[in-house]
């Protein structure tokens, strides 16, 4: 019998689970570029270079995007998939058509540019065009900037472009905030990321706004998107746009070089043409890489400020919880307080304050209607022995008649 018991125990102690993964086709859920060869699994840890880290970030981002697109595609029905493909093709056709149209515009401008250069009417019309494309969802802002440099030269074109951009973006900000006010409130109540980003702008709001304006984002859409942040004021947004106005010299310079190439094409030497073409390419590359660099810095700064804001809220919650006192308002501004309250609820769930601690016993006093009082309400209105004019002293009134009753409902609530 002991031998049978020992053999049975040894048999039960042997693991019957296979060390291999249950699903041999697990890698099929990942796109081809995210799969690594067996010999390269530890290549990132061996190299440890910055290029490996950047490569991993690009692969992870591409993988997440691939999964999101694939998940959205699987949720669509037949007609939704047809509409998505049609919208994708239409967007590509519009983009190609816009590029072709832009080229035709500069060909058409070549014979009239010299006449319009000293025309106040042409100056005013182009200024209004730049102003109105500031409102979403209009496009053509960069094209109008290049046209300004093409017709009026670098400095005069930049002055037109910058002044119309500053005033147009400010007016677009005000109009978008007025129209999108209800959308802002709904977004503040539901989206924690939106609330966190709006709170980060209260620290170095002007600096972050300038970085956002330098990012390669759609101009008119950016005006409408930033207007939804309640912590950003119109004057601050206009000031940030004015501070980054030297960036607008790039399209004006490109337009001026295009005119020089078109007018003096036959007279210019090969070296002069190469210099002008290279200056255009270098200007475009500087604008693209500067925008991408600032975009990454903006995201990093926003994450840093969000972490700081969450840390401050977490300390406040822990201090209030330890002192058994209700949470005060985070800010006098109702919009800022609403965003902070949303983050506070998220932090309470992370910390675990949503669940009551077993070591504490709270005394909850129900009202006459028998409704339960939440722990937050109990802390806000603690039990008191004093009587006010509206309360009755049961010891002073005596027993009273047989029909009169005084009841005190107390419950010791253990979470």
Curated annotation (Swiss-Prot):
Biased composition of type Polar residues is found at 1-10, 371-381
Segments carrying the region annotation (Disordered) are: 1-49, 365-415
Q: Name one GO biological process term.
A: mitotic spindle elongation
One Gene Ontology term, aspect cellular component: Golgi membrane
Task: List localization entries.
Answer: Golgi apparatus membrane
Transmembrane intervals: 82-102, 121-141, 158-180, 235-255, 274-294
Keyword field contains Phosphoprotein: no
Q: Name one Pfam family in it.
A: VTT_dom
Q: Domain annotation text?
A: The VTT domain was previously called the SNARE-assoc domain. As there is no evidence that this domain associates with SNARE proteins, it was renamed as VMP1, TMEM41, and TVP38 (VTT) domain.
Question: What's this protein's family per the entry?
Answer: Belongs to the TVP38/TMEM64 family.
UniProt-recorded name of the protein: Golgi apparatus membrane protein tvp38
Organism of this sequence = Aspergillus niger (strain ATCC MYA-4892 / CBS 513.88 / FGSC A1513)
């Amino acid at each position: 019998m002991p031998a049978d018991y020992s053999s049975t125990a040894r048999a039960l102690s042997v693991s019957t689970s296979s060390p291999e993964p249950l699903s041999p086709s697990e890698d099929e859920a990942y796109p081809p570029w995210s799969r690594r060869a067996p010999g390269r699994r530890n290549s990132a840890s061996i190299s440890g270079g910055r290029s490996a880290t950047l490569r991993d970030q690009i692969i992870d981002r591409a993988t997440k995007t691939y999964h999101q697109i694939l998940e959205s595609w699987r949720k669509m029905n037949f007609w939704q998939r047809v509409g998505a493909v049609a919208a994708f093709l239409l967007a590509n056709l519009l983009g190609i058509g816009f590029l072709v149209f832009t080229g035709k515009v500069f060909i058409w401008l070549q014979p009239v540019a010299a006449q319009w250069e000293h025309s106040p009417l042409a100056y005013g019309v182009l200024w209004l065009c730049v102003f109105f494309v500031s409102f979403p969802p209009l496009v053509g802002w960069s094209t109008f900037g290049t046209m300004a440099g093409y017709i009026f030269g670098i400095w005069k074109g930049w002055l037109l472009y910058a002044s119309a951009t500053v005033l147009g973006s400010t007016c677009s900000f005000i109009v978008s905030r007025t129209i999108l006010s209800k959308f802002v409130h709904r977004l503040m109540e539901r989206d924690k990321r939106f609330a966190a980003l709006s709170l980060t702008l209260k620290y170095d709001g002007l600096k972050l706004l300038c970085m956002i304006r330098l990012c390669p984002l759609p101009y008119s859409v950016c005006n409408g998107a930033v207007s939804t942040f309640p912590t950003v004021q119109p004057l601050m947004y206009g000031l940030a746009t004015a501070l980054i106005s030297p960036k607008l010299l790039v399209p004006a310079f490109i337009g001026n070089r295009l005119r020089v190439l078109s007018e003096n094409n036959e007279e210019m030497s090969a070296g002069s043409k190469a210099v002008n073409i290279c200056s255009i390419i270098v200007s475009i590359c500087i604008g693209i890489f500067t925008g991408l660099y600032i975009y990454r810095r903006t995201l990093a700064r926003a994450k840093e400020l969000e972490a700081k804001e969450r840390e401050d809220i977490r300390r406040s919650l822990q201090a209030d919880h330890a002192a058994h006192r209700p949470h005060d308002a985070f800010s006098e501004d109702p919009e800022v307080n609403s965003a902070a309250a949303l983050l506070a609820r998220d932090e309470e769930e992370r910390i675990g304050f949503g669940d009551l601690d077993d070591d504490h016993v709270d005394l909850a006093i129900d009202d006459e209607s028998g409704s339960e009082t939440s722990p937050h309400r109990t802390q806000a209105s603690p039990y008191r022995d004093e009587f006010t004019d509206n309360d009755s002293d049961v010891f002073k009134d005596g027993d009273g008649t047989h029909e009169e009753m005084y009841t005190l409902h107390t419950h010791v609530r253990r979470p």
